[in-house]
Amino acid sequence: MAHAFAIRDVRRRLEESNGGYEIVHRSPRLEIGVYVLVAPQADTQQPHDDDEAYVVLSGRGTLDVAGTSFAVTEGDALFVEAGAEHRFTGYESLSVLVIFTRAD
């Protein structure tokens, strides 16, 4: 089975509504979503039970992971291990593709 996703349309819709998260695919072992943050909205993520990867679609900011900060900009990819405290900061507008692996 295969799916195609219009990521730019999802991103545009979320940007127009001042941010949020929208799932574009969910299966037993994978979740893909688009996460848009618009200042002054805070990133209120809590640690997750699953590994997570981000691909920055647009914008720039900082990803703070367990006391380490990473400057991020369009095209960057990042990995966050399950259970790690993390959040985006220092952005005006930031759009990321989010990929969660699900444990068996």
Question: Over which residues does each language-model region extend?
Answer:
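Conserved GNAT-family N-acetyltransferase fold
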Residues: Y35, Y54, L78
